[in-house]
């Protein structure tokens, strides 16, 4: 049989014979479930993060970091959920400075004043000090150095000890003014220092809980509405209504008059609206509620009031971000599922996202009391005695952009089982990447409390995940899979290849398996800021073509699949002068393999390579280097 390619490895020459390739079915869902399930068996999980990125710890000993945001003054802003602090570090900070405490710009005291609980509380609200967003004109207008914060500020009923009673907290959103040390009016004592001061309350008395507060903030990157101003968006969860110690709490995610289980849309500055003359919190907040919001209150006496509700039917959306794909801005969100079906959604106004009537994709009907399985009968403690698909169609539900583990009905785990093995990734936040890491442009980065970081490559329209961008819908190489990641911030420099993550201080959850104290489950590198720097930027295209059939060639040669497990296929243009010399090198250019082919289509066996990133160099028959491709070996 004729050899396709002659290889020289370490000076030994041998022939590779052609054979029929098996189609690769590396399903993301199966991969993830198996990886999660075998943790207890101490299986070795190959993490390719260090193959692609340099990782440095630049700060540590943070008090349950919850938010990390890249600020317009090139600082990283971090909120501490249990420290009730806002701190800053320079984006240029290195590992040599990791023992230097971050700069504290705001601290709200616990156990006194408006925060009527402290660290000794047996049941902590989910979150605490939560989301942070910085006004787009922070640096261009000295009068708009505004920062917005959300935090839980009042415990009304949440018994300590072993009681299984419902926990009632209250949450607020505030507007702050930031002062540099040299700014006129800086309120700090001499010598002045950078400081953040609360100047107004946007919303107060919002529902709060020890579960599903959500609490993420973002600001539209463009001015909108009849007042032509930036708008503030806030995720607020369903309070854990219908589960664990809140199982008797009413779930209001489908009630558009309330704030639970919603995404809210607010003004970034008061609009001056006069009172509507009715006694209601929406009247109290009227100057912060945009006049073009989609809903008026449905009760007749309050119908003059706009509500802050932008979308509804959310369970626990802890991530929200704007992204621009090919000139179109979209609002994206990540949301925790129940026992399965975590979601990534495109957020639209006046739109129903299904919870607690539907979990994840409505078409799979994996929650129902009408089938033969017992573990999938309820959502939020309510009987699902209907078809999810029928309900979604009848009620105009928006289908998720992406859902993890749209598990079959027979596979839904039982209530009371170990929640750490449930088929979920626990998506804690989301960000949008439009930089120049090869193959990553226009991707959503979804952080996970169970399994690190995932990338979803969007199609050119921005409204679907590009399932043709890699062998699986998300990257098949693991990223930060040993860490419990709370949030991610991305450098605005498209060529820096730099982003930062904050790691949760413990592995505790809101459920009974994790415990309520938040102190009994260890996690890797807890309470740190990790800086990830892409190892090299080369003029390469990272082609991610999963088709086993021949792809369309845009350059002289194309390789697929990428990432690869064992076999790389190469497809070249026929006008290439033969013979072709192919070399495989590491990222430092050191030659590992080389071979010669007289054909346009051939394959390379790379199973002997260690997991990581490699270069494939192509030379034509004249000895001219005509193309370099980068590929990932799993």
Placement of each model-derived feature along the sequence:
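Short, compositionally biased serine/threonine- and acidic-rich segments at solvent-exposed termini, linkers
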Residues: 535-546
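Beta-propeller domain segments
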Residues: 113-123, 127-129, 137-139, 228-231, ...
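Residue-level detector of beta-propeller blades
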Residues: 57, 104, 198, 473, ...
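Bacterial Sec-dependent N-terminal signal peptides
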Residues: 1-45, 542
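C-terminal outer-membrane/trafficking sorting elements
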Residues: 2-16, 546-560, 564-634
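Solvent-exposed strand-loop boundary residues in beta-sheet-rich modules
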Residues: 92, 269, 459, 535, ...
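Repeated scaffold domains used in trafficking and secretory/extracellular systems
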Residues: 485-487
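Acidic, Gly/Ser/Thr-rich repeat motifs that build Ca2+-stabilized beta-propeller blades
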Residues: 44-241, 319-324, 329-337, 423-466, ...
